[in-house]
Amino acid sequence: MRQILEDSQLRRAMQLGVILIVGSCLISQLMMQLGGGARDERVDLTGQAPEGFEDEGFIFEDGFPPFISSAGAFMPERIVFNFGLFTGGVLMILLSFEVFHRTKPEGTKRNVANVTALITGVIIGFSMVQLVGHPFNTSLIMHIFWA
C-alpha cells in the first residue's frame, strides 16, 4: 500500500482537521454572539426563500440565530469561520485520499466500501469548502444545499 504521510503525520493531520473545524466554529460563534451591532438587528431572508415558502421562518426578529452558519455573515468572525471550514474541508479531501491509498483491499466487498469512504470524504470536504463560498445570509438556498 502506498502512503504519502507517516503514521504520526497522519495522526497529527487528522487532529489538526478536527481542531480547525471545531475550533473555528466555536471561536467564530463566540465572536458572533458577543459582537452585537448588526448581528442583533432583525434579519429578513424572505427575498432568498423559494417561491411559496416566504412565510416559513425566514425572518429572525432578534437578529442572527445561534446557528454555526451565522458566524459566516460578518467580519471579523467570518474570517475565523471561513479559514477553519475551508482549510478543514481541503484537509478532509486530502486525508480521504491518504486513507483510501493506505487501505486498498484485495477483496471486492472491501473495495466497494473503500471507494464509498473515499467518495463520501471528498463530498463532505468539498461541501465544507462550498459553505464558505455561500454564506447563509447572501446565498441561503445554496448554503442549505451544501450544508
What are these regions (language model features)?
Residues 2, 10, 14-147:
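Early transmembrane hairpin module of multi-pass membrane proteins
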